Amino acid sequence: MAVRASFENNCEVGCFAKLTNTYCLVAIGGSENFYSVFEGELSDTIPVVHASIAGCRIIGRMCVGNRHGLLVPNNTTDQELQHIRNSLPDSVQIRRVEERLSALGNVTTCNDYVALVHPDLDRETEEILADVLKVEVFRQTVADQVLVGSYCVFSNQGGLVHPKTSIEDQDELSSLLQVPLVAGTVNRGSEVIAAGMVVNDWCAFCGLDTTSTELSVVESVFKLNEAKPSTIATSMRDSLIDSLT
């Protein structure tokens, strides 16, 4: 299921929300309408939490997370950290990271198994990422852009990358991530895909300007039509991966 939304008439929903398979963070403020769109789709399965990070509402660009954990920048206040800790499931680890490239959502992107990071990210941050989020980390660019977190979005089912990504790059990224990739846009031609949408294994939220063609591409590449919110599928995949490794 792919749904359109906007935050105070702003279609960059990926800036104001962070969605994973175990929780969803939504920026404080804004209209209640934005929050209720997420709550309407997700509240039966995962917690939807109002939050700010380092006093900012652009939480989607400030943090990186998956079902195992959440990394936030070092300037996140104790109060914000405590609120997020209290609101998320106990199984989710939350860690503050001291990183020069502090907009973590712009310089890293991940699903539950693999992460792509900015080529200049600190080694220490890379280790924390691998440890807390339980992912394999690759230093990569997307269409020669170092901000991999801005120009690429992927779940455990599929991924959408910058429209100018070459076929060779798509194939390389696809083999690293082990999911099918499609080059495309959101919000009527926006190349900054991660700012315009958020996605997990069964649901996507795109900006209000997203065309029906873009929406159908999102639904097909992320396999949202056949998807059900299910921890069973996740645990089955985990056991399969364990048996293969």
From Swiss-Prot:
Binds to the 60S ribosomal subunit and prevents its association with the 40S ribosomal subunit to form the 80S initiation complex in the cytoplasm. Behaves as a stimulatory translation initiation factor downstream insulin/growth factors. Is also involved in ribosome biogenesis. Associates with pre-60S subunits in the nucleus and is involved in its nuclear export. Cytoplasmic release of TIF6 from 60S subunits and nuclear relocalization is promoted by a RACK1 (RACK1)-dependent protein kinase C activity. The modification Phosphothreonine is found at residue 165. SMART domains: eIF6. Its main location: cytoplasm. GO terms for molecular function: ribosomal large subunit binding; ribosome binding; translation initiation factor activity. GO terms for cellular component: cytoplasm; cytosol; intermediate filament; lamin filament; nucleolus; nucleus; synapse. Monomer. Associates with the 60S ribosomal subunit. Interacts with RACK1. Interacts with DICER1, AGO2, TARBP2, MOV10 and RPL7A; they form a large RNA-induced silencing complex (RISC). This is Eukaryotic translation initiation factor 6. InterPro entries: eIF6. It comes from the Eukaryota. The modification Phosphoserine is found at residues 166, 174-175, 235, 239, 243. Pfam families: eIF-6. Belongs to the eIF-6 family. The gene is Eif6. Phosphorylation at Ser-174 and Ser-175 by CSNK1D/CK1 promotes nuclear export. Ufmylated by UFL1. One of its GO terms (biological process) is regulation of glycolytic process. It is found in: Cytoplasm; Nucleus, Nucleolus. Keywords: Cytoplasm, Initiation factor, Nucleus, Phosphoprotein, Protein biosynthesis, Ribosome biogenesis, Ubl conjugation.
